[in-house]
């Protein structure tokens, strides 16, 4: 989870030490995806910069295809931007859930598929 306040500047450098391309889509970032959110090939790195203009809770995730599988494998999280003058709370809970829908065996998984057992496991 990334956290900040309205007006904070974020600078995140990602180095891809894996074997396939990856990227990050910061929903809170309001940036042009063609310039800063392109896929990072193995061995490359890219620095993402954005300023938080609005308070709220947004998702960030790998946006390189197969995106749904990257998210289902944990390549996602939350960006929490607090508003000015936020009052203290007694407790705070930060949850994030993901799903992956599988097709027939060896056909992959994506958003166009449906659960094999929609009424339970």
Residue positions per predicted region:
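Beta-sandwich strand segments
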Residues: 70-73, 87, 108
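Short loop/turn segments at secondary-structure transitions that flank enzyme active sites
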Residues: 30, 68, 85, 101-104
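A short, polar/charged loop/turn motif at coil->beta-strand junctions and beta-hairpin connectors
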Residues: 18, 89-91, 115-117
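Short, surface-exposed, charged/polar-biased interaction segments
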Residues: 45-47, 83, 100, 116
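Histidine- and aromatic-enriched segments that form or immediately flank copper-ligand environments
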Residues: 1-81
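Acidic-aromatic/histidine active-site loop/patch
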Residues: 96-121
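Low-complexity, Pro/Ser/Thr- and charge-rich linker/hinge segments at domain boundaries
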Residues: 80-96, 104
């Amino acid at each position: 989870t990334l956290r900040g306040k309205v007006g904070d500047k974020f600078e995140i450098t990602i180095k891809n030490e894996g074997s396939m391309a990856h990227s990050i889509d910061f929903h809170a970032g309001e940036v042009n995806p063609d310039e800063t959110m392109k896929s990072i090939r193995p061995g490359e790195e890219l620095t993402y910069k954005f300023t938080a203009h609005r308070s709220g809770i947004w998702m960030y995730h790998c946006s390189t295809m197969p995106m749904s599988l990257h998210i289902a494998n944990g390549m996602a999280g939350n960006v929490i931007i607090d508003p000015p003058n936020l009052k203290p709370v007694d407790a705070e809970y930060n949850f994030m859930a993901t799903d992956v829908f599988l097709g027939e065996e060896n056909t992959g998984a994506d958003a166009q598929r449906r659960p094999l057992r929609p009424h339970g496991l």
